[in-house]
Amino acid sequence: MNAVDTNILFYAQDPRDPLKQSTASSLIWSLPNGILFWQVICEFIASARKLEPFGYDCEKAFHDVRELGRSWDTVFPDWATLDGAMELTSRQSISFWDASIISECLLNGVVRLYSEDLDTHDGIDGLEIINPFRNP
């Protein structure tokens, strides 16, 4: 299973960096077995306001994640997610929000998480975290 962080969804719609936009969009639509996390959906819709000057708004963001949700599973947080996030926050020294996404990945069999912000060469607890914008 594969998942993307909020920034990947955001860059797919952000025309200010055409290379990142192309990379993110291609990645999203080429990933097999994708999972959308509720937190990522909410953050993406909220962040779409930053793209209003470019003709992209919350309504379009909502439409796009609904469309993506037709081919990807959607996962909602539960207490196990929060428990895992609290443990990861103290053990890995990462923010609670990042830990929540990682916890969701670990609980739902995600093997690869694509994120610009969480990039780590070592991964976390077997989860591979990949920055798709980094040159190999």
Show the residue positions of the predicted features:
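Acidic, PIN/NYN-like endoribonuclease modules and their adjacent C-terminal/linker elements
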Residues: 1, 102-136
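Aromatic- and histidine-enriched alpha-helix N-cap/loop-to-helix transition segments
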Residues: 36-39, 96
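Alpha-helix C-capping/helix-to-loop hinge sites
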Residues: 12, 30-31, 47-51, 68-72, ...
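Short, well-structured N-terminal submotif of metal-dependent ribonuclease cores
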Residues: 1-36, 51-63, 136
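Active-site neighborhoods of divalent-metal-dependent phosphate/nucleic-acid chemistry enzymes
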Residues: 72-114
